[in-house]
Amino acid sequence: MKALLILGLLLFSVAVQGKVFERCELARSLKRFGMDNFRGISLANWMCLARWESNYNTQATNYNAGDQSTDYGIFQINSHWWCNDGKTPGAVNACHLPCGALLQDDITQAVACAKRVVSDPQGIRAWVAWRSHCQNQDLTSYIQGCGV
């Protein structure tokens, strides 16, 4: 009985953690989703963004006390502008999806919403982590050895 309880707890912790992509696994996935040079943004830029926003974790969330919004998923897409979490005051939901959809292991909806974000005039500069860690940097290491 004790062994079953421990096994159950281990399985629960894995389910809650979500998918953490390996670097090259994510690079290949993003390439398949057409992210390389989408709106002129290189695959290496997307990889750098995902690394600094979520460390490649689909379940990452971060609460922003200032505007009471939350950033969701592998790209840390914000609930004030892009998705609906049912609790962010004045949410716009420009991607027309529930924020929980951005936390799925299948990143199809997260990619579609990220494409929507960069279609706005601010582009990839909408992400603070990209401006702080990726802009004007050599990003080759993010895709090196991945065959993409």
UniProtKB/Swiss-Prot annotation:
One Gene Ontology term of the molecular function aspect: lysozyme activity
Residue positions of the active site: 53, 71
Disulfide cross-links: 24-146, 48-134, 83-99, 95-113
Domain C-type lysozyme: 19-148
Signal peptide range: 1-18
EC number: 3.2.1.17
Record's catalysed reaction(s): Hydrolysis of (1->4)-beta-linkages between N-acetylmuramic acid and N-acetyl-D-glucosamine residues in a peptidoglycan and between N-acetyl-D-glucosamine residues in chitodextrins
Tissue distribution: Expressed in blood cells.
Alphabetic keyword roster: Antimicrobial, Bacteriolytic enzyme, Disulfide bond, Glycosidase, Hydrolase, Signal
InterPro entries tied to this protein: Glyco_hydro_22, Glyco_hydro_22_CS, Glyco_hydro_22_lys, Lysozyme-like_dom_sf
EC class of the enzyme, as a word: hydrolase
Biological-process GO terms, alphabetical: defense response to Gram-negative bacterium; defense response to Gram-positive bacterium; killing of cells of another organism
Entry keyword Hydrolase: yes
Family: Belongs to the glycosyl hydrolase 22 family.
Function field: Lysozymes have primarily a bacteriolytic function; those in tissues and body fluids are associated with the monocyte-macrophage system and enhance the activity of immunoagents.
Record protein name field: Lysozyme C, non-stomach isozyme
Organism: Bos taurus
Gene name for this UniProt entry: LYS
